[in-house]
């Protein structure tokens, strides 16, 4: 499909694929193979030299993965995409692609616990540091930028507090300083928000969540916006000749430079590859993405209203509420609403009561995932954000009494009844 005027609901079903030319299969075939036969020795040489973009080995690329990547790129409005083994791998590769020893990134402090530890604990061991800032004021990002800063990073909706950032302002700051904006858009999906239209240059997703949607597959994806000048003098790995590929200069690849370098270098050398089978499952999920997100959001709005009016609930952290400090930004960037993952706190913020409430839930499952068709609940302070200290938890918007919900697509009256009976028991 080359017509860029197709609407989202059509692209999520068709983008990146035509019926199989050999068999006529309408569904995307699963190419469950490690390797691909070359026509002759010259053909093999051309592929290894990146002169022929077709598949060599499934760690680097696979026809099933190709469809998934093209479809995601189309839905996000990007130039290219790369599927990898997990959302964490997508984030790691996005940073390692542009930063090295002595460099830093500036990141919002409101992050998923695993990402926070990647930035604060793991990447520093490789010489890459992170300056965490309160994202409520865009000036905090600008004040943290120095000559070694390689990117600004944030999540579209912070995990788990649902904070909203002034994306346009951040994009303008990054552009002024000649650095890219890398955005984790897992919680919003391309259904409700398009980061490339608001200053982003690279998007990462945990495809495990809404993209897959059914809690069956692990994977991540990196989307290249094709809208950043990697030859601006700040990124020598893109402008210096890479001798492992006969002197190629990745910046000369233009709008596909970012993901091509990850595929050619990082994926080749460190191998966090996406399984073709998982790509195939993600493609099944994508076909109903907008339909599921619509139900996720409609259910969430009713549950937020229920909890906000419950006498045992002190606070509901969702920006759709007029009382929420992010409501104005939410209205600006999400006119059709977004966010089916949110937190709430009981009246006394008691940790035991919060954990007891979760244990009393019957439909909501206690597990470490979000964006599933099934409704989920968890206690972040003791699980997903356990590695953070008290100050870091507070910076991420989490207390010992915080409960996180990921609202599924079940009948909302059943979900409210489940929450009501659990609240009655504490």
Model region roles, listed by residue range:
Residues 152, 220-222, 316, 342, ...:
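Well-ordered beta-strand positions enriched in small/hydrophobic/aromatic, beta-favoring residues
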Residues 120, 147, 348-352, 375-426:
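PLP-dependent enzyme catalytic core of the Aspartate aminotransferase-like
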Residues 2-62, 70-71:
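N-terminal "arm"/small-domain region of PLP-dependent enzymes with the aminotransferase-like
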């Amino acid at each position: 499909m080359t017509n860029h005027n197709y609407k989202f609901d059509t692209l999520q079903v068709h983008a990146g694929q035509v019926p199989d030319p050999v068999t006529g299969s309408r569904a995307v075939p699963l190419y469950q193979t490690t390797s691909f036969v070359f026509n002759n020795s010259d053909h093999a040489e051309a592929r290894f030299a990146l002169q022929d973009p077709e598949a060599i080995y499934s760690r680097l690329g696979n026809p099933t993965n190709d469809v998934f990547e093209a479809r995601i790129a189309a839905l996000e409005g990007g130039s290219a995409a790369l599927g990898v083994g997990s959302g964490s791998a997508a984030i790691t590769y996005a940073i390692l692609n542009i930063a090295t020893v002595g460099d830093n990134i500036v990141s919002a402090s409101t992050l998923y616990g695993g990402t926070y530890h990647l930035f604060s604990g793991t990447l520093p061991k490789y010489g890459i540091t992170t300056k965490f800032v309160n994202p409520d004021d865009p000036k905090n990002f600008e004040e943290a930028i120095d000559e070694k800063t390689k990117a600004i990073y944030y999540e579209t909706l912070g995990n788990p507090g649902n904070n909203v950032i002034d994306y346009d302002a951040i994009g303008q700051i990054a552009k002024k300083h000649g650095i890219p904006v890398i955005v984790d858009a897992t919680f919003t999906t391309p259904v409700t928000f398009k980061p490339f239209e608001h200053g982003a240059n690279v998007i990462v997703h945990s495809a495990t969540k809404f993209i897959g949607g059914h809690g069956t597959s692990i994977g991540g994806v990196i989307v290249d916006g094709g809208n950043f000048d990697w030859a601006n003098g700040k990124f020598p790995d893109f402008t210096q000749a890479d001798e492992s590929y006969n002197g190629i200069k990745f910046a000369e690849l233009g709008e596909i430079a970012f993901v091509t370098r990850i595929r050619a270098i990082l994926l080749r050398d460190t191998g966090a590859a996406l399984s073709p089978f998982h790509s195939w499952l993600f493609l099944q999920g994508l076909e109903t993405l907008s339909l599921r997100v619509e139900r996720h959001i409609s259910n969430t709005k009713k549950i937020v209203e229920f909890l906000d009016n419950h006498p045992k609930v002190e606070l509901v952290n969702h920006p759709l509420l007029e009382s929420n400090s992010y409501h104005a930004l939410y209205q600006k960037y999400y006119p059709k609403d977004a966010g089916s993952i949110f937190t709430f706190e009981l009246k006394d913020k008691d940790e035991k009561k919060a954990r007891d409430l979760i244990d009393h839930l019957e439909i909501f499952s206690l597990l470490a995932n979000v964006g599933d068709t099934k409704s989920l609940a968890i206690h972040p302070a003791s699980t997903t954000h356990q590695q953070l200290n008290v100050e870091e938890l507070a910076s991420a918007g989490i207390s010992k009494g915080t409960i996180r919900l990921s609202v599924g697509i079940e009948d909302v009256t059943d979900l409210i009844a489940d929450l009501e009976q659990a609240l009655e028991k504490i």
